[in-house]
Amino acid sequence: MVNIFLANGFEEVEALTSADLLRRAEIDVLLVSTEKDIYVTGNHNICVKCDVMLADAPDCDMIVLPGGIPGVPNLMSNKEVTDRVKKQSESEQRVAAICAAPWILGELKITEGTEVICYPGFEDKLKGAVISTKSTVTDKNVTTSKAAGTAMDFALEIIKVLKGDDVALKVKNSIYY
């Protein structure tokens, strides 16, 4: 089970590419509204009806944090979001963040001693991190990726982490990527 946390201002490509490809890999995915409404509006005014409200979101194998401004600051300002992400990491469950969202992991000190990547210019927000030169990287229980342009690689990496190389390759081939 993967929970993708959405706040108003999220980056649509990063969130929806992840949801789509993970579902193609037959991974249970919930789009989780962290707002007061089940509908969340992305940074480019695409409105998405989420599957569940944050208060009703079950425990999961991975929390995915899409980027986007003001989506990332909106996620970061929600104590229930940061508490869940911190608990997820501390229990050695997986977290994934793309674009500006690794900033949240930095604020929670999850990036310390971990190889990560983020949107260029946000590196100083990744406290104690080892900044990767890769566009997408998994280290320990953390998967990160650079930007909307790496959303396909990010989603395929999550599939690889959760279901293995063969399933990731099958999904990749099925979309002719």
Model features per residue range: what roles?
Residues 1-5, 10, 23-33, 51-177:
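Active-site-adjacent pocket-lining segments in enzyme domains
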Residues 10-15, 39:
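Short N-terminal binding/cap micro-motifs at the start of the first secondary-structure element
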Residues 14-24:
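Short, solvent-exposed amphipathic alpha-helices that sit
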